[in-house]
């Protein structure tokens, strides 16, 4: 499958982020956000989605991790949209259920051009490492709205918060992989409207 590479650079008063992704990669990653737990989750997304991701973020972590996490979502969303191009031949939809020990998460994606997000999480701790658990939803929202996708993410059950979030990011990677895969039987885009 041919490469689909996008580079995005974004600088604001709060963050500076540069990224390069290949949607049809091997799951290679080199991710540095300054937030260890977040790096770990993004590495999992890349590996399990077979998406190559190089990303470096410098943010105002002396304030907290909110701006960095959200802006990484913005940049990855923009990268994803750019790499997809005209969306011809992609399957459009992707769904994945991923277990992580006692936890089970699901992510469903529609590369629709209509950004929307639904999250159903019940985390029982406020923080893992240096990352607030509420920022999982902020990241997913920024990703979805900047990529132009509908995204539903849910933790069906679990006790360990690390396991729950890890299952979400693995499921995200796998759902993305399924949605962007191309099918030679699809003529144009997967829509009766003729556009996504």
UniProtKB/Swiss-Prot annotation:
It is found in: Cytoplasm. Pathway: Amino-acid biosynthesis; L-histidine biosynthesis; L-histidine from 5-phospho-alpha-D-ribose 1-diphosphate: step 6/9. Its main location: cytoplasm. One of its GO terms (cellular component) is cytoplasm. One of its GO terms (biological process) is L-histidine biosynthetic process. SUPFAM superfamilies: Ribosomal protein S5 domain 2-like. The keyword Protease does not apply. The keyword Amino-acid biosynthesis applies. InterPro entries: IGPD_sf, ImidazoleglycerolP_deHydtase, ImidazoleglycerP_deHydtase_CS, Ribosomal_Su5_D2-typ_SF. This is Imidazoleglycerol-phosphate dehydratase. The gene is hisB.
